[in-house]
């Protein structure tokens, strides 16, 4: 897995999670980009022999962060954030499977 790919994954994760953490709202486009980068990492992982430590750590971070951020919000927004967390978790599982 190339360094550039891991950097893009980190950037996508930060672009989605940081605004949630700062209580700035839910960004659907940032979520879609995060899922795309996770999928790219999955493709690279299947073509390679290992997952670099930096990539593994980056893949492990979004779900608990998203789940924790959900409690900053109420109602339908909280529910959507929790759904997004589950979607990200499923994407990571598929990428590493």
Question: What is the meaning of each model-derived region?
Answer:
Residues 8-11, 15-18, 50, 54, ...:
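Residue-level signal for well-ordered alpha-helical segments
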Residues 58-97:
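Amphipathic alpha-helical binding modules
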Residues 20-27, 48, 52, 74, ...:
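Alpha-helical rod/repeat scaffolding segments in eukaryotic adaptors/tethers
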Residues 16-23, 41, 45, 69-73, ...:
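Secondary-structure edge/capping motif, primarily at the C-terminal ends of alpha-helices
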Residues 1-35:
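Short terminal alpha-helical segments
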Residues 4, 8, 33, 37-40, ...:
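Charged, amphipathic alpha-helical oligomerization/scaffolding segments
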């Amino acid at each position: 897995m190339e360094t550039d790919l891991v950097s893009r994954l980190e950037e996508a994760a930060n672009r989605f999670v940081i605004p949630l953490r700062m209580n700035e709202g839910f960004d659907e486009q940032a979520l879609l980009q995060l899922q795309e980068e996770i999928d790219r990492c999955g493709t690279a992982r299947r073509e390679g022999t290992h997952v670099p430590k930096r990539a593994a750590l980056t893949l492990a971070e979004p779900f608990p962060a998203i789940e924790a951020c959900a409690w900053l919000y109420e109602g339908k927004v909280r529910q959507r954030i929790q759904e997004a967390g589950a979607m990200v978790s499923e994407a990571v599982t598929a990428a590493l499977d």
